[in-house]
From Swiss-Prot:
Protein task: Hydrolyzes ribosome-free peptidyl-tRNAs (with 1 or more amino acids incorporated), which drop off the ribosome during protein synthesis, or as a result of ribosome stalling. Catalyzes the release of premature peptidyl moieties from peptidyl-tRNA molecules trapped in stalled 50S ribosomal subunits, and thus maintains levels of free tRNAs and 50S ribosomes.
Name of the protein in question: Peptidyl-tRNA hydrolase
Catalytic reactions of this protein: an N-acyl-L-alpha-aminoacyl-tRNA + H2O = an N-acyl-L-amino acid + a tRNA + H(+)
Species of the source: Syntrophomonas wolfei subsp. wolfei (strain DSM 2245B / Goettingen)
Gene name of the record: pth
Pfam families listed in its UniProt record: Pept_tRNA_hydro
């Protein structure tokens, strides 16, 4: 079993914002593969599906971004997972828009949702996929809570699809194969 966490903020108000790109990747995976079961558990929506017979949990924390660890840790413990079985997808202002980067571990890059997860798990040693949203011309909060422009939308849709494919590769062949194929 593997757990995929897409970071975002709950509610319609935030559904199309840059900060919710992690949720969008989970939605793309749910579109590609049939969800067997969906439940609300530990401050998160959890979808269950299979890719090549591997059970995958799609987790959307219902806490706000900065408290994502509050939802992730109890699920991680409940399902008795190893750090290598967790993958987190999130936005990154330090990458150009539409860029997808896969890593086996790493820092938080100042991302509050990742900081919360790393603190709650007591480790940064788990796979992650960062999706570039670019640097803001103004304030960071307005940028991440803003929606993509019409010209950005096709680029971001390509990134969502690429990230979903990278996750499928991770499930089937591991993080090294995913990094080699999609970085």
């Amino acid at each position: 079993m593997k757990m995929l966490v897409g970071l975002g903020n709950p509610g319609k108000k935030y559904s199309h914002t840059r900060h919710n790109i992690g949720f969008k990747v989970l939605e793309e995976l749910a579109r590609r593969h049939q969800i067997e079961k969906e439940e609300s558990r530990y401050d998160a929506i959890v979808g269950h599906l299979r890719i090549n017979q591997e059970k995958l949990l799609l987790v959307k924390p219902l806490t706000f971004m900065n408290l994502s660890g509050k939802a992730v840790r109890p699920l991680f413990n409940w399902f008795k997972l190893e750090l290598s079985e967790l993958l987190v997808v999130y936005d990154d202002m330090d990458l150009p828009p539409g860029t997808v980067r896969i890593r086996a571990s790493g820092g938080t890059g100042g991302h509050k949702g990742m900081q919360s997860i790393c603190e709650s798990l007591g480790s940064r040693d788990f796979p992650r996929i960062r999706i570039g949203i670019g640097r803001p011309p103004g304030g960071a909060i307005d940028w991440v809570l803003g929606e993509f422009s019409e010209s950005e939308k096709p680029l971001m849709q390509d990134a969502i699809e690429k990230a979903a494919s990278a996750i499928e590769c991770w499930v089937k062949s591991g993080i090294d194969a995913s990094m080699n194929a999609y970085n």
